């Protein structure tokens, strides 16, 4: 069990929150009506010196839920064919159940109280995860119901860029545009970006908070 008073521990860095990077690919913008087609998650860890690093990765292609809307423009944009049997897609329930199980394990190991979604334009990904969890009747959702860490906002502050590819390149993180709009690739790059932003703030002296400012 991690010590919450240890500022080099994950639980001490984010006030007991356990950050998990998420990216989804969908068949539209409406989380209630449009299909979730792909999801990836990257958990994070702190090393002994307090530097944030990617940890475990989970990735699933997802079958559209019954009656889901499939917007042709969205499918053309992300290049996903929901009917392709080679996708190896699973149900929303199975995908989220596996992710939630891994997240709850990480919560316990890191001594955190609750998971929080990290994503680029996080409201979008958060809304699809929450809607899918409700459809799948998954009661033990480890994620905060509304709070998120948004790397688009953080990148705008730190790097002057809000587009994922431009933010990564500005931060010195390679970004292959030909792999963009794959949930797996975007999640991995977003995880690297979030770690870079958090670690850069530490290097600049912003963390731990100077004595007197945290009181």
Swiss-Prot record:
What cofactor does this chain's UniProt record say it requires?
Mg(2+)
Q: What is this protein called?
A: Ribonuclease T
Q: Its Enzyme Commission number?
A: 3.1.13.-
**Active site location:** 181 (proton donor/acceptor)
Gene Ontology MF: a single term: RNA exonuclease activity, producing 5'-phosphomonoesters
Task: Tell me its family.
Answer: Belongs to the RNase T family.
> Do you know which Gene3D superfamilies this protein is assigned to?
Ribonuclease H-like superfamily/Ribonuclease H
Q: Which UniProt keywords apply?
A: Exonuclease, Hydrolase, Magnesium, Metal-binding, Nuclease, tRNA processing
GO terms of biological process kind? DNA replication proofreading; tRNA processing
Is rRNA processing set as a keyword in this record? no
